């Protein structure tokens, strides 16, 4: 017993001693964490260079765009062929995907040889061989008569400009077929298939084995966004933000980047860690000076590295008592599979003895221990280096996402990772130390990269079908110039109907006389109160207007909320609330004594019989207060003031917000004769010739007409351009069948149109993984401000995702792109429709005056116009295209329509004074 313990102790001491000797001998191969972190930094820099348009031509890490933009989402289906060429054998698979049965994937495959004479022969020989194997495979399965979609895993560095094209940059591994470098491998394969003429195949996608691995694992885990191969060769790919990929147009979404990291160090950046053995391996390789990182880490070279170390140590008398055999000196006699066998925990030393005996060196126990440790150092260095480069990718992903902690999945394949007994454990452990702020799940690709090629093909098919359906849906929102000219023509016809006495009562566009007969002339003077009611907020203003050489307008205002229960309660409650707010404001300003003139901006359709009387025709914008429609709102206000018995006011003018906006801008710019509001609601007004206003006596001069154009289309004249979504929004609104034009244009409804489209797309599985969340079911969730933010050019997709998350919608990058697209289509149509309406107005003014050209200014207000990044530009462009004989300027109303109400009141007071004197 004691003897056995002594023997074990002696053997352990002996082993430790041998290990220390080897550690010392191979010191250069043992990399500290500090060195590995430095390598991470270097690789991160190389990645950046590869992605940059300026540095890519000279970058060693090529960072090749793959044009794979999306990982599987589980809805893929179909029957696909996959070719997998890149190693010692060539595999063909038939992959049948059925998403209805728990993502069921049925695969059958066959392996074909790629003999040396073919991989080192001509390109046409190689692709003839591939085409022959594919024909044999299809013949056996009786599918030669089908034009099957084919995914091609081609595991060599390729330049791609689309997913079904791949120009070989350089052969790697043992391949050297002539005439292929610089050529499109898809064309070469298609040519070989065509030459045979006995079957047809549609090559939909070419992918690298790394991309194939990511896609294979991505089918099982949708968080998989990195692919890693550690086998005969090594490489990695990951999903990069498109905005960082200079070589590809566009900045929306993500694309898989094939790093081709095997070439890391080809520019000399790893010389400080390369050893004499690495240099010797490189000198004896098929591609000296290339793939230097791969030659330090991949399965093709590890066995050879160990052999070179053993030869040198034997020559120096440190192993095998200096014995060197012809076998030990022969390249390829010591393989990576031998390294794996020797590093096994229990039988490793026994395996070492067997393998070394096969090489004829008659090893001692010491030799076996030493050789085992040499293998450990070489394979451990490989694991450490791969951990460093993968760590750089993970840090980049984390920074791209802007999250303090990354959670992701890495799909892995390759014989070294799979079969080496210690490799994966060491690799994971090092990675955790290097990137402690990343939680990484490693998912082994059980089916190789061939299934991934089929998945890329399936995704390409799914995306093409989705794209077709999305385009089909959104096409209904695209308006041609002819369609817009027709809208302009119809608006003009409706305007005429509203102006004529005979047709006015039945007209949809009411063309209401405002009794505002002129714009300010600069002589207005005095202090005026203004009320502004038109949305969920209500403003009370004190406006001090001073005339003279230096005209000034000084304003003080306070905003009050109108609760929903008052908006939809009784008329008395609404006007009592308004008077209560006025009372508070008069106290706040200390002006409750004198009877002041007041202008009331009342932004709802009213029939006016004079400047100070407006009979409400209908409520819009969510208001539903009872006992108001059909009554004079000025009288309702006066009655409420009387009920309060605190103060008195002189209600001089009832004006629409659009008229107020026109007057505000006309005070600054005399050519302003049109007012436009595009905010919660939408409306326009303009100065019409009195002779055309049949509803008011007299035909001298002009009068501002409040068009109430929101009701355009209420008679069905826009039904041919209204979509299914417009009808849905209308149906569920408070005023179904009314304000149809407004519901296609204004901020109150655009978000609802978007929401309904998103629900439809989610039901079809195009968005949010097909899950309709509670927030998405909530009406009114998409406010104008969110649409404006989402469509901002300055906003990266991450910020779009953040906005959607704020709304309770968890989106992927692809989801964010589609949401942004939908918002853009809906808001573009709104701007074009608004422009068509405005074109009708300015052309009418021009024709009224018999002018060949008209110069006119439009005063504009409203949140959609002000805040949306593209609305105003598209609207201006539309007006320009549809009314080429009008030079139209747009002036933003900075002070809102309240100031306009005060100016109208001032004009009214001036005219009243003039009349009485």
Curated annotation (Swiss-Prot):
Q: Which sites bind D-glucose 6-phosphate 1?
A: 84-91, 209, 232, 413-415, 449
The EC class name is transferase
Q: How does it sit in the membrane?
A: Peripheral membrane protein
Q: Name one GO molecular function term.
A: D-glucose binding
Cellular component terms, GO, for this chain's entry?
Answer: cytosol; mitochondrial outer membrane
Residues that, per the record, bind D-glucose 1:
155, 172-173, 208-209, 235, 260, 291-294
Region annotation Hexokinase small subdomain 2: where it falls in the sequence: 521-655
The places in or outside the cell where this protein is found are:
Mitochondrion outer membrane; Cytoplasm, Cytosol
What CDD domains does the entry give?
ASKHA_NBD_HK1_meta_rpt1, ASKHA_NBD_HK1_meta_rpt2
Q: Where is this region: Hexokinase large subdomain 1?
A: 208-447
Where does this protein hold D-glucose 2? 603-604, 620-621, 656-657, 682-683, 708, 742
Residues annotated for ATP 2 binding in this entry: 532-537, 680, 747-748, 784-788, 863-867
Highest taxon, organism lineage: Eukaryota
Name where it mostly resides. Answer: mitochondrion
Q: Any idea which positions bind ATP 1?
A: 30, 84-89, 345, 425-426
Is-annotated flag, keyword Glycosyltransferase?
no
Keyword Membrane carried by entry = yes
Question: What reaction does this enzyme carry out catalytically?
Answer: a D-hexose + ATP = a D-hexose 6-phosphate + ADP + H(+); D-fructose + ATP = D-fructose 6-phosphate + ADP + H(+); D-glucose + ATP = D-glucose 6-phosphate + ADP + H(+); D-mannose + ATP = D-mannose 6-phosphate + ADP + H(+)
Annotated Gene3D superfamilies: 3.30.420.40, 3.40.367.20
Q: Kindly state the subunit structure of this protein.
A: Monomer. Interacts with RABL2/RABL2A; binds preferentially to GTP-bound RABL2. Interacts with VDAC1. The HK1-VDAC1 complex interacts with ATF2. Interacts (via N-terminal spermatogenic cell-specific region) with PFKM (via C-terminus). Interacts with SMAD5.
Q: Which family does it belong to?
A: Belongs to the hexokinase family.
* Entry domain remark: The N- and C-terminal halves of this hexokinase contain a hexokinase domain. The catalytic activity is associated with the C-terminus while regulatory function is associated with the N-terminus. Each domain can bind a single D-glucose and D-glucose 6-phosphate molecule.
- This protein is called Hexokinase-1
**Species:** Pongo abelii
Tell me the lineage of the source organism: Eukaryota, Metazoa, Chordata, Craniata, Vertebrata
């Amino acid at each position: 017993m004691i003897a056995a313990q002594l023997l074990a102790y002696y053997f352990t001491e002996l082993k430790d001693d041998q290990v220390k000797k080897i550690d010392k001998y191979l010191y250069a191969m043992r990399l500290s964490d500090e060195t590995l972190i430095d390598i991470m930094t270097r690789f991160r820099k190389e990645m950046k260079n590869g992605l940059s348009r300026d540095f890519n031509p000279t970058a060693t890490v090529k960072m090749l765009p793959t044009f794979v933009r999306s990982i599987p989402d589980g809805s893929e289906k179909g029957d696909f062929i996959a070719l997998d060429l890149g190693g010692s054998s060539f595999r063909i698979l038939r992959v049948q995907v059925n998403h209805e049965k728990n993502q069921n994937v049925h695969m059958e495959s066959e392996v074909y040889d790629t003999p040396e004479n073919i991989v080192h022969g001509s390109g046409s020989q190689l692709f003839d061989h591939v085409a022959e194997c594919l024909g044999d495979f299809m013949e056996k399965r009786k599918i030669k008569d089908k034009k099957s979609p084919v995914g091609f895993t081609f595991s060599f560095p390729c330049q791609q400009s689309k997913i079904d094209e791949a120009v070989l940059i350089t052969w790697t591994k043992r391949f050297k077929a002539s005439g292929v470098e610089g050529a499109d491998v898809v064309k070469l394969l298609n040519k070989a298939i065509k030459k045979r003429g006995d079957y047809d195949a549609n090559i939909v996608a070419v992918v690298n084995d790394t991309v194939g691995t990511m896609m294979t694992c991505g089918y099982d885990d949708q968080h998989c966004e990195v692919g890693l191969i550690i086998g005969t060769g090594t490489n990695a790919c990951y999903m990069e933000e498109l905005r960082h990929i200079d070589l590809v147009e566009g900045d929306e979404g993500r694309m898989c980047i094939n790093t081709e990291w095997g070439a890391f160090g080809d520019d000399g950046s790893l010389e400080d860690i390369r050893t004499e053995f690495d240099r010797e391996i490189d000198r004896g390789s098929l591609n000296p000076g290339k793939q230097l990182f791969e030659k330090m880490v991949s399965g093709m070279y590890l066995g050879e590295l160990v052999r070179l170390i053993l030869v040198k140590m034997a020559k120096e008398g440190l192993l095998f008592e200096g014995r060197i055999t012809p076998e030990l000196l022969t390249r390829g006699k010591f393989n990576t599979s031998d390294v794996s066998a020797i590093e096994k925990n229990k039988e490793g030393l026994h395996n070492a003895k067997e393998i070394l005996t096969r090489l004829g060196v008659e090893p001692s126990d010491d030799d076996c221990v030493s050789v085992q440790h040499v293998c450990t150092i070489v394979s451990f260095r490989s694991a450490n280096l791969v951990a460093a480069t993968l760590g750089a990718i993970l840090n980049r992903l984390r920074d791209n996402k802007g999250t303090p902690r990354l959670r992701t999945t890495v799909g892995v394949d390759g014989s070294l990772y799979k079969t080496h007994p210690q490799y994966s454990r060491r690799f994971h452990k090092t990675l955790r130390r290097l990137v402690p702020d990343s939680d990484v799940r490693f998912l082994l690709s059980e089916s190789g990269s061939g299934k991934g090629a089929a998945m890329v093909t399936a995704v390409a098919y799914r995306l093409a079908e989705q794209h077709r359906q999305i385009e089909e849906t959104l096409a209904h929102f695209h308006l041609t110039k002819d369609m817009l000219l027709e809208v302009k023509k119809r608006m003009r016809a409706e305007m005429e109907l509203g102006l004529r006495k005979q047709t006015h009562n039945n007209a949809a566009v009411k063309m209401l006389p405002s009794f505002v007969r002129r714009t300010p002339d600069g002589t207005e003077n005095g202090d005026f109160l203004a009320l502004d009611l038109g949305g969920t907020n209500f403003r009370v203003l004190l406006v001090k207007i001073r005339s003279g050489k230096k005209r000034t307008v000084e304003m003080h205002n306070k905003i009050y909320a109108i609760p929903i229960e008052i908006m939809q309660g009784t008329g008395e409650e609404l006007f009592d609330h308004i008077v209560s707010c006025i009372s508070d404001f008069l106290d706040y300003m200390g002006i409750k004594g004198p009877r002041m003139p007041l202008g009331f901006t009342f932004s709802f359709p009213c029939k006016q019989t004079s400047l100070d009387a407006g009979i409400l025709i209908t409520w819009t914008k969510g208001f539903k207060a009872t006992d108001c429609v059909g009554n004079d709102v000025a009288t309702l206000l006066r009655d409420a003031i009387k009920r309060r018995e605190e103060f008195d006011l002189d209600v001089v003018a009832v004006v629409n917000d659009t008229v107020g906006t026109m007057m505000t801008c006309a005070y600054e710019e005399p050519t302003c004769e049109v007012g436009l509001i595009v905010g919660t609601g939408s409306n326009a007004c303009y100065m019409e010739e009195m002779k055309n206003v049949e509803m008011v006596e007299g035909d001298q001069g002009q009068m501002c007409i409040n068009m109430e154009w929101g009701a355009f289309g209420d008679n069905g004249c826009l039904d041919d351009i209204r979509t299914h979504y417009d009808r849905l929004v209308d149906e569920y609104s408070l005023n179904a069948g009314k304000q149809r034009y407004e519901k296609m244009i204004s901020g109150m409804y655009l978000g609802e149109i978007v929401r309904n489209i998103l629900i439809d797309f989610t039901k079809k599985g195009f968005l949010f993984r097909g899950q309709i969340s509670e927030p998405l079911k909530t009406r009114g969730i998409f406010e104008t401000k969110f649409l404006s933010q989402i469509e901002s050019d300055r906003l990266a997709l991450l910020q779009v995702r953040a906005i959607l998350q704020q709304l309770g919608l968890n989106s992927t990058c692809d989801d964010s792109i589609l949401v942004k697209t939908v918002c853009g289509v809906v808001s573009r149509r709104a701007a074009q429709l608004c422009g068509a309406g405005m074109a009708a107005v300015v052309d009418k003014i021009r024709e009224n005056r018999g002018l060949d050209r008209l110069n006119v200014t439009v005063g504009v207000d409203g949140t959609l116009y002000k805040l949306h990044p593209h609305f105003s530009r598209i609207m201006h462009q539309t007006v320009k295209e549809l009314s080429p004989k009008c030079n139209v300027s747009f002036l933003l109303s900075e002070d809102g329509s309240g100031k306009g109400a005060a100016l109208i009141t001032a004009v009214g007071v001036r005219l009243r004074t003039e009349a009485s004197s």
